[in-house]
């Protein structure tokens, strides 16, 4: 077990550096990350990243000059193997404190493709919206609820990521790493 703990330290150090230093120093302005709430008759699609492990919404950053919705479709394809239609914007989740950024969340539906994990997201799985895993990072619960509520207009929510968010993320990550249940549900 000590070898597994030692392997986590570089990952946590990288995430700490990114969370404390990198986002405010971006030359292109505030960081915007794009996420998709992908819904189908199978449920909602969630993924687990290879670095900080816990269930989350697929998505990521735009390349320089890339429109947000195009970046979202590209990231979802890379991470899940699915091509999606972006139906509507759910909202902007403005996060201050650790890893300050805005998460721009869209409701999506799958068009084609086969669900497959990637090196970046080794686990991808459908979940019933009424039975989400307890290892879902808590900062994804509000965007999921907003997407499922089919609100008439996009929302803007402000969240502060302090020590509670950091410790919650670490607990989920450690549980996923050391659990025999690789899905963490």
Task: Describe the predicted segments one by one.
Residues 1-35:
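Acidic, metal-coordinating catalytic segment for phosphate/diphosphate chemistry
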Residues 53-54, 120-185:
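Nudix hydrolase/Nudix homology domain
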Residues 82-91:
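A short coil-to-beta-strand element that immediately follows conserved catalytic motifs
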Residues 39-78:
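Conserved Nudix-box catalytic region and its N-terminal flanking loop in Nudix hydrolases
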Residues 60, 74-75, 87, 127-130:
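Structural detector for helix-capping/boundary residues
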Residues 93-116, 125, 129, 140-151:
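Active-site-adjacent beta-strand/loop module that shapes the phosphate/pyrophosphate-binding cleft
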